[in-house]
Amino acid sequence: MAWLICLWIFNLMEKPAQKPHYPYFSSGPCAKPPGWSFDNLKNAALSRSHSSGAAVKKLQEVIDKSRQLLEIPDDYLIGIVPASDTGAVEMAMWCMLGQRGVEVYSWENFGHDWNIDAGEQLPLKDKKLIKAEYGELPDFSNSNPDNDIVFTWNGTTAGVRIKNTDWISNQRKGLTICDATSAVFSMHMDWHKLDVITYSWQKVLGSEAAHGMLILSPRAVERLETFTPPWPIPKIFRLANNQKLISGIFSGATINTPSMISVEDVLNSLNWGLELGGLNKLIDISETNLKLVNNWIDKHDNFEFLAKDPETRSCTSICILPKDEWFKTLNDEDKVNFMKEVCSLLESNEAGYDLNSYKTAPPGIRIWGGSTVENKNVELVLPWIDWAYLTTKEAFKK
């Protein structure tokens, strides 16, 4: 009997035979689209002014193809803004909040950051800050349609997404400001429930960092043209002058100088998505990645989802935790160090990069499952995660 147990342990510890052919699972910047190469950038408008006709044409093309791929309503404005998704969210909050009461819903790191903006940085008089722990959603049921609402569609650091937008009133008087950076292109957006939508190029599109996208409904534009906040607005955040929308932002005249090589790269990603089959195809890839992880967890004892409710599990930032009793006996510092060793082992074997959970999240694994991550690569990294976990566990126990 003892030799059978030893053989079983040996088989668990044996390295998987196959590695992902593209072992990149970072949650930002994320994996490049399949087949990407530097040749894709050869037509970039390099050495040209970003306000030249050639550059503005490319910037406008980013706007137009984003609308096409995301199926954004025609009466919504789309702008390219500085400082990635963070810049887009904060310019919306600083330019639009203050007219009404505001509710900020958060359940992971970046949502908590918007909570800090509303709760500590902006002098808002009427505010409700509604938080939930990692792995859970806050209670949306008492949301007041007279208030402005700030929330993330998908919590990137928790792997928890909203179930639906039923809690947002069609007769709302307030604005909804949605950080959708790890949701767009991999999840269907309920555009008519959203007034301000933000995201970056570096997430599901697999493009480069530092550039954000800001999408405004007609109601959001009306707010900018009828309300001026009582605090100063830096130029980098400014969307209106004297209650008049700076419309150039939404036609390729960016607030500051964009990287034209990054512009070319995001155009490549948008073209890839359109040629692949559009939004539904991108969503299908990502949802299949979640199913692969779910099926693997169902058959193994080492991990569980951070999100307990299956309906809230993200198909992009897929967060899993060790669940065996041995791991639970470790103190917090040892849990963090243990998972660092697991991820270091995966990297040293070139089986998977950047799989560690976010620094403020419970120690675990975060697999990026966005649409640029091919299903086969997710399928192949899972046995490697098992192997790395068991191998590290044996070393830790000695």
Q: Where does each model-flagged region fall?
A:
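PLP-dependent aminotransferase-like
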Residues: 87, 94-149
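Active-site C-terminal subdomain of aminotransferase-like
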Residues: 202-295
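Conserved PLP-dependent catalytic core of the aminotransferase class-I/II
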Residues: 65-73, 272-307, 345
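N-terminal "arm"/small-domain region of PLP-dependent enzymes with the aminotransferase-like
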Residues: 8-53
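Conserved C-terminal alpha-helix-loop-beta "cap" of PLP-dependent enzymes
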Residues: 298, 302-376, 380
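Conserved N-terminal alpha-helix of the aminotransferase class I/II PLP-enzyme fold
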Residues: 39-91, 95, 109-117, 298
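Conserved active-site segment immediately N-terminal to the catalytic lysine
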Residues: 191-202, 212
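Active-site phosphate-binding strand-loop segment of PLP-dependent enzymes
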Residues: 133-185, 196, 204
